[in-house]
Regions:
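Conserved helicase RecA-like core
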Residues: 1-303
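A short, hydrophobic/aromatic-rich structural module that often spans a beta strand
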Residues: 28, 314-316
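Acidic, serine/threonine-rich intrinsically disordered low-complexity regions
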Residues: 317-377
């Protein structure tokens, strides 16, 4: 059995895969399963199958080789909602509080975000079991989380895309994508955790306003169209002040918040599709406040990238330059540039040495606010 073979191809290991298949007996039966009919899957079929027969659970599925359309379960109810970056934490908390009797899977873009949201929400006691799953956990921990979540009737699992493929959780009611997927195929794999077999399911995609057009176009190009809903701000619970108190009292949680922020910005920066993921203009300070931080940490890899862009930028006409070199003031960013590489290896990109500004006041909402907040209007 070879799992995630299409991803192996995507990562450039086609020659290695061909060599492995070359050692198999020539007389054999090969079954190729995929949730998505993508070009990589078609390439894999050509590589490993002879005279293949295409079988789909959807009678209307396209049998055209290289079809770009992706199939979704007919019993999946899906929506997207626009959500400012600084509002995501409040929206997630409000959603959980209004769906306590559901089984929910929430996707975030990085392990550090998963860990922070799990630890922060756990301290706030939402009234339903919380679990988290990501690739930085040890194998026995991941297996334990998968087993426990599978057995629970009502629970929330925060996860990276580790949970998007190859896992079959029984009876998930909701899949919430707090961060946009990298592409349409990832979207399909995420929402495919619900509405499995004959059961129904719901999917909600939260998009920044800057992500809306690019993401919807990318999905539409693969045959996926999602209706929009509006989040009622008046019905959304605010937990910013509570997170700020927790971060002040618990240095570990504050540190997790800083790492989560940097990790999110890095994930946006490293995404290839810049029509969707735009690091410029991200409200970093407002996002920091929403995580309970009094100020955003310095993001060193971003400073390095900005410095590199300035160095590579064309020089202004000489007429606009000062004749005296001493009149040109340095921005000082070069002094902040570190020599470490750009890998997401931990904490080298988080600079917490700056003095903390005074606490930021966050408006409190009424206690009986509910997430009909995410009212489907």
């Amino acid at each position: 059995m070879l799992d995630e073979a299409d991803r192996i191809l995507d990562m450039g290991f086609s020659r290695t895969l061909s060599a492995l298949l070359g050692h198999l007996p020539k007389s054999r039966q090969t079954l190729l399963f995929s949730a998505t009919q993508t070009q990589s899957v078609s390439d894999l079929a050509r590589l490993s199958l002879q005279n293949p027969v295409f079988i789909s659970t959807d009678a209307a599925a396209s049998t055209v080789e290289g079809s770009t359309h992706l199939e979704l379960p007919a019993n999946l109810e899906q929506h997207y909602a626009l959500c400012a970056l600084e509002s995501k934490t409040n929206v997630l908390w409000s959603f959980i509080k209004s769906h306590l009797q559901n089984k929910t899977l929430i996707f975030l873009s990085s392990a550090k975000q998963v860990r922070f949201v799990f630890e922060a929400f756990r301290r706030l006691h939402p009234g339903t079991p919380l679990l988290h799953l990501h690739g930085q956990q040890k194998q026995h921990t991941r297996l334990d989380v998968v087993t426990r979540f599978g057995r629970m009737q009502h629970a929330v699992l925060f996860a990276t895309d580790l949970a998007a493929r190859g896992l079959d959780f029984p009876s998930i009611d909701w899949v919430v994508q707090a961060d946009a997927p990298e592409d349409a195929a990832t979207y399909v794999h995420r929402v495919g955790r619900t509405a499995r077999y004959a059961k129904g399911g719901h999917a909600l995609l939260l998009l920044l306003p800057s992500e809306e057009q690019g993401m919807l176009e990318a999905l539409k190009a693969r045959g996926i169209e999602i209706p929009s809903i509006k989040i009622r701000a008046s019905k959304t619970l605010s937990i910013g002040d509570q997170l700020q108190r927790l971060a002040f009292q618990d240095p570990e949680l504050k540190y997790l918040a800083q790492r989560a922020l940097v990790s999110y910005v890095r994930s946006v920066y490293l995404h290839h599709d810049k029509s969707i993921f735009k690091v410029e203009g991200l409200p970093v300070e407002a996002f920091a406040a929403s995580l309970g931080l009094a100020g955003a940490p310095k993001i060193r890899f971003l400073s390095r990238a900005q410095t590199k862009d300035r160095k590579n930028a064309p020089r202004a006409p000489t007429a606009l330059q000062s004749e005296d070199e001493g009149d040109v003031q340095s921005s000082g960013t070069e002094d902040e540039v570190a020599d470490s590489d750009e890998r997401d290896s931990g904490d080298e990109d988080v600079d917490t040495s700056q003095d903390e500004p005074p606490p930021v006041a966050v408006e409190k909402q009424g206690k009986d606010a509910k997430v009909s907040a995410l009212s489907f209007s």
